[in-house]
């Protein structure tokens, strides 16, 4: 199978870059700059990502770049540098990189001045092209052995270079973002130059992952952390397909679930997937430990530690359990700061209960069969495993549950309030036939009360916020319905108006409803 190694220097777009390459049916994997070269030298191509580093203000060229380019000198294995990746390549080939010079952010027009294999059948000399830039440093002069393919119209700075003989290419812009219209075609050309075969599919992933699970587990037993969501359901189905009754599924009722969730889990796993499940009610334990806790990171840590403690109790009832299966996916690892080959150089956004919330004393070895997949890939995998569309299209639900949708202190009363409001909202979205055209929708309960009037009397109740977003892979998101057609927009506005009335009239304790229109970034999809 063809494979592309992406060296991640901390770009916010690295995960998107990996996803775009997979869209071309070529497997890509992300590695930190401190990876040992021997672990990655068997790939078909290298890509050096962008990132916040500055060549003029750094301690020199990273060792991994030296290793890759020395290997390229012997083998001509293709190398692509993007943004900072271009700058570090240029510096290696004796070009000057200047800090805070010719900055460019956003849409930029290029003048194409020379033909190259990297732009074949896309652009040609004399064309102008639209791309997306995000850089403060610039390559000042032409790297040794390279030719300039394009300059920026804005300031005549170097935007694209090529060394055709050694098959090394550099782009100051970001071909991986959707704002570079021809970006996917440029990546496809680079992968064609590398001779990559389009042989990565979900079907091949299933076969490979089953073999990997069997090899990792041997004759031991696995206890599975089920949530009832898409990720853990698909992970359980894949693992069960690989090892059968060696998998023991446990569903913990933590008291922070969606309305009637336990019954839905029974229907899903026992009736549809035919996978045995042990259901354990520990809602009182979770709510007691979360009493008076308001900090979202502490909530996540407490929930993660409590989950593991309970799983260890359940595992002790079985013999030979050494592994814990989780439905961790790529964005979970990214937002938690990551671990291993896909760790980020960026800051931690939030701890994911499957990743950053796990206690260091955890006794289990982890089985995470989906940790290299994005959400849409997980759904494709689920369809190939025979899981129904209704299950696969369930909106994402956070591992810590309603704990991160109740801002501030958590009480049983607030949980019931939020469950009722969320159930009303989701059912109305389904009534208006909008559920399947959005990525995620939910209600957030705020820690503030507002004055209202009901039945000629003053009320003083909680405010809640409705949220709905569209996304492709969970890495970025747009507020719904502003990205949709006019008919869908009006339908949704009627829906949230009806939801507001229904929540206020039906849910005791809520007297005001607002709507969140913030995109990701700058916000995350969840509030905590």
From Swiss-Prot:
Pathway: Purine metabolism; GMP biosynthesis; GMP from XMP (L-Gln route): step 1/1. GO terms for cellular component: cytosol. The keyword ATP-binding applies. The active site is at residues 83, 174, 176. SUPFAM superfamilies: Adenine nucleotide alpha hydrolases-like (SSF52402), Class I glutamine amidotransferase-like (SSF52317), GMP synthetase C-terminal dimerisation domain (SSF54810). Residues 200-394 form the GMPS ATP-PPase domain. GO terms for molecular function: ATP binding; GMP synthase activity. Keywords: ATP-binding, Glutamine amidotransferase, GMP biosynthesis, Ligase, Nucleotide-binding, Purine biosynthesis. Its EC number is 6.3.5.2. It catalyses: XMP + L-glutamine + ATP + H2O = GMP + L-glutamate + AMP + diphosphate + 2 H(+). Residues 3-199 form the Glutamine amidotransferase type-1 domain. It is an enzyme of class 6 (ligase). Pfam families: GATase, GMP_synt_C, NAD_synthase. PROSITE patterns: GATASE_TYPE_1 (PS51273), GMPS_ATP_PPASE (PS51553). InterPro entries: Class_I_gatase-like (IPR029062), GATASE (IPR017926), GMP_synth_C (IPR001674), GMP_synth_GATase (IPR004739), GMP_synthase (IPR022955), GMPS_ATP_PPase_dom (IPR025777), NAD/GMP_synthase (IPR022310), Rossmann-like_a/b/a_fold (IPR014729). It comes from the Bacteria. The keyword Nucleotide-binding applies. ATP binds at residues 227-233. HAMAP family: GMP_synthase. Homodimer. Catalyzes the synthesis of GMP from XMP. This is GMP synthase [glutamine-hydrolyzing]. It comes from Ehrlichia ruminantium (strain Welgevonden).
């Amino acid at each position: 199978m063809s494979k592309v190694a992406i060296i991640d220097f901390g770009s916010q777009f690295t995960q998107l870059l990996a996803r775009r390459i997979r869209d071309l049916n070529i497997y890509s994997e992300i590695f930190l700059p401190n990876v040992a070269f021997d672990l990655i030298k068997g790939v078909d191509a290298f890509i050096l990502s962008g990132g916040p580093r500055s060549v003029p203000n750094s301690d020199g060229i990273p060792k991994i770049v030296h290793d890759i380019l020395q290997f390229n000198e012997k083998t001509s294995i293709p190398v692509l540098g993007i943004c900072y990746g271009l700058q570090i390549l240029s510096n290696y080939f004796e070009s000057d990189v200047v800090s805070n010079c010719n900055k460019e952010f956003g849409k930029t027009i290029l003048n194409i001045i020379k033909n190259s294999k990297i732009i074949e059948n896309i652009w040609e000399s004399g064309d102008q092209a639209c791309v997306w830039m995000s850089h403060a440093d610039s390559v000042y002069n032409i790297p040794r052995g390279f030719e300039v393919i394009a300059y920026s119209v804005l300031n005549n700075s170097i935007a694209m270079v090529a060394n055709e003989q050694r098959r090394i290419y550099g782009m100051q812009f970001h071909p991986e973002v959707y704002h570079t219209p021809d970006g996917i075609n440029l990546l496809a050309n680079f992968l064609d130059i590398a001779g990559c075969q389009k042989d990565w599919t979900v079907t091949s992933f299933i076969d490979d992952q089953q073999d990997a699970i069997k090899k990792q587990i041997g004759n031991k037993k696995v206890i599975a952390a089920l949530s009832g969501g898409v990720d853990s359901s698909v992970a359980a189905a894949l693992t069960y397909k690989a090892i059968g009754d060696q998998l023991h599924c446990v569903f913990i009722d933590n008291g922070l679930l969606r309305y009637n969730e336990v019954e839905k889990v029974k229907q899903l796993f026992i009736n549809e997937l035919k996978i045995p499940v042990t259901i354990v009610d520990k809602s009182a334990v979770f709510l007691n430990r979360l009493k008076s806790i308001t900090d979202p990171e502490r909530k996540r840590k407490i929930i993660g530690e409590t989950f593991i403690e309970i799983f260890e109790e359940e595992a002790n009832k079985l013999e030979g359990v050494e592994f814990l299966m989780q439905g961790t996916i790529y964005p979970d690892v990214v937002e938690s700061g990551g671990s291993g080959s896909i760790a980020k150089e960026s800051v931690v956004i939030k701890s994911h209960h499957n990743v950053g919330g796990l206690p260091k004393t955890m006794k289990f070895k982890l089985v995470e069969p989906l940790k290299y997949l994005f959400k849409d890939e997980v759904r494709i995998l689920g369809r190939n495993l025979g899981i129904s569309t209704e299950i696969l299209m369930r909106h994402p639900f956070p591992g810590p549950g309603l704990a991160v949708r109740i801002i501030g202190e958590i009480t049983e009363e607030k949980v019931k309030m939020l469950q009722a409001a969320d159930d009303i909202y989701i059912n109305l979205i389904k009534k208006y036939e909008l559920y399947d055209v959005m990525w995620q929708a939910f209600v957030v309960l705020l820690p503030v009360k507002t004055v209202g009037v009901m039945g000629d009397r003053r009320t003083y109740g909680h405010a809640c916020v409705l949220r709905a977003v569209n996304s492709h892979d969970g890495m970025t998101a747009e507020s719904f319905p502003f990205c949709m057609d006019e008919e869908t927009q009006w339908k949704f506005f009627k829906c949230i108006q009806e939801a507001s009335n229904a929540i206020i009239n039906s849910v005791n304790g809520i007297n005001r409803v607002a709507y969140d229109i913030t995109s990701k970034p700058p916000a995350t999809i969840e509030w905590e």
